[in-house]
């Protein structure tokens, strides 16, 4: 069910979004060769608690940790483990939090240390730019298929691919709400966005095939050909004349 948020609800989501943005900035500053993934998870959980929020990932459908850390060919939903980041790793972090039961969700990808392959940098840049291009067009009346087509066309112009099985989504009192927003589509098709909706746009991009597979842990999603991946996401309010990003972080 699609929900329209009132001003009180929007304010709570803005608080969650700002705490999340600051928590992700903390993680960006920590990502260096030699850092343990468990330390990143612990630092984020402590940060959001200190700032009046709760985790919305931990125990969600049985997920055991507070953030998702996906490395290199891992696209999404990587479980933080006793693993040390290496120089040149492509690291994606997807995280969320709740303030008084209202959710926010965001993700970023960066290279740990120095990129070993220039194409990895291009992949990351293209994925973030695809998100920015989609956000620039958000306003009441735009249709979900148009959003997906913007992302797909930009990504595929660089000969990268967008997986078909994982999408953006609405968000509010639940982490995942209607509408679901694929990273591909046909312009002028699908549900129209309305003022007061809050959605998550999240381009997930693979350097090779669009196909994916799930690891034995039943959570971690890989590119089927083990090509490098990237993922960016923001929680976004649809306003009267456009949109407002609730999880914007400083570069």
Curated annotation (Swiss-Prot):
Gene3D superfamilies: Creatinase/methionine aminopeptidase superfamily (3.90.230.10). Its cofactor is Co(2+); Zn(2+); Mn(2+); Fe(2+). Binds 2 divalent metal cations per subunit. Has a high-affinity and a low affinity metal-binding site. The true nature of the physiological cofactor is under debate. The enzyme is active with cobalt, zinc, manganese or divalent iron ions. Most likely, methionine aminopeptidases function as mononuclear Fe(2+)-metalloproteases under physiological conditions, and the catalytically relevant metal-binding site has been assigned to the histidine-containing high-affinity site. A divalent metal cation 1 binds at residues 94, 105, 233. Substrate binds at residues 77, 176. It catalyses: Release of N-terminal amino acids, preferentially methionine, from peptides and arylamides. A divalent metal cation 2 binds at residues 105, 169, 202, 233. One of its GO terms (biological process) is proteolysis. InterPro entries: Creatinase/aminopeptidase-like, Pept_M24, Pept_M24_MAP, Pept_M24A_MAP1. GO terms for cellular component: cytosol. It holds the Pfam family Peptidase_M24. One of its GO terms (molecular function) is metalloaminopeptidase activity. It comes from the Bacteria. Its EC number is 3.4.11.18. Keywords: Aminopeptidase, Hydrolase, Metal-binding, Protease. PROSITE patterns: MAP_1. Removes the N-terminal methionine from nascent proteins. The N-terminal methionine is often cleaved when the second residue in the primary sequence is small and uncharged (Met-Ala-, Cys, Gly, Pro, Ser, Thr, or Val). Requires deformylation of the N(alpha)-formylated initiator methionine before it can be hydrolyzed. Monomer. Belongs to the peptidase M24A family. Methionine aminopeptidase type 1 subfamily. This is Methionine aminopeptidase. The lineage of its organism: Bacteria, Bacillati, Mycoplasmatota, Mollicutes, Mycoplasmataceae.
């Amino acid at each position: 069910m699609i929900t329209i948020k009132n001003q009180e609800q929007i304010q709570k989501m803005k608080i969650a979004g700002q705490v999340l943005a600051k928590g992700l900035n903390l993680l960006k500053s920590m990502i260096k060769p030699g850092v343990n993934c468990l330390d990143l998870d612990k630092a984020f959980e402590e940060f959001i608690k200190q700032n009046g929020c709760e985790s919305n990932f931990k125990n969600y459908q049985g997920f055991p940790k507070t953030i998702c850390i996906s490395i290199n060919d891992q696209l999404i939903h990587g479980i933080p483990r006793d693993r040390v980041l290496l120089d040149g790793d492509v690291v994606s972090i997807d995280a969320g939090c709740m303030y008084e039961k209202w959710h926010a969700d965001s993700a970023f990808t960066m290279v740990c240390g120095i990129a070993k392959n220039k194409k990895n940098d291009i992949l990351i840049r293209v994925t973030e730019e695809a998100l920015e291009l989609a956000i620039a067009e958000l306003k009441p009346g735009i249709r979900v298929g148009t959003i997906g087509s913007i992302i797909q066309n930009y990504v595929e112009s660089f000969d990268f691919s967008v997986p078909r099985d994982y999408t953006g989504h609405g968000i509010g009192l639940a982490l995942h709400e209607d509408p679901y927003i694929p990273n591909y589509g046909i312009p002028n098709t699908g549900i129209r966005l309305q003022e007061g909706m809050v959605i998550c746009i999240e381009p997930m991009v693979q350097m090779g095939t669009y196909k994916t597979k799930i690891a034995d842990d039943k959570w971690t999603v890989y590119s089927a050909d083990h090509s490098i991946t990237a993922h960016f996401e923001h929680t976004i309010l649809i306003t009267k004349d456009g949109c407002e990003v609730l999880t914007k972080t400083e570069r």
